[in-house]
């Protein structure tokens, strides 16, 4: 497997983690709004969570640019600017698709 193929596979995995995290945040907000007061996550927070094991700044930048492109192109994700605590505006992503359990689609198609 070439380096490019390995990176593409890694990007796909990182995108899936990001989408699952956004879906879980949306669900957590409606299930327990005290512990999850916002239905969205800052793209920067999500980047730091998803790439916590990548310590090279240039690699993080390159990987995140590709992840960001895929996530923002997903019809289930809405990107907005939100004012955070302290008054700073930051880019946030919110899951707007179904929050059903991820494995349910597989079960429906098997029957």
Residue map of PLM features:
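Intrinsically disordered, low-complexity juxtamembrane tails/stalks of eukaryotic membrane proteins
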Residues: 3-111
């Amino acid at each position: 497997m070439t380096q490019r193929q390995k990176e593409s596979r890694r990007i796909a995995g990182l995108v899936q983690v990001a989408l699952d995290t956004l879906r879980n945040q949306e669900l957590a907000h409606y299930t327990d709004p005290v512990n999850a007061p916002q239905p969205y996550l800052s793209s920067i927070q999500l980047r730091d969570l998803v790439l916590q094991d990548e310590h090279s700044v240039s690699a993080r930048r390159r990987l995140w640019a590709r992840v960001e492109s895929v996530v923002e192109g997903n019809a289930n994700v809405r990107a907005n600017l939100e004012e955070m605590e302290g008054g700073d505006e930051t880019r946030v992503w919110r899951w707007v698709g179904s929050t059903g359990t991820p494995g349910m689609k597989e079960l429906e198609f098997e029957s």
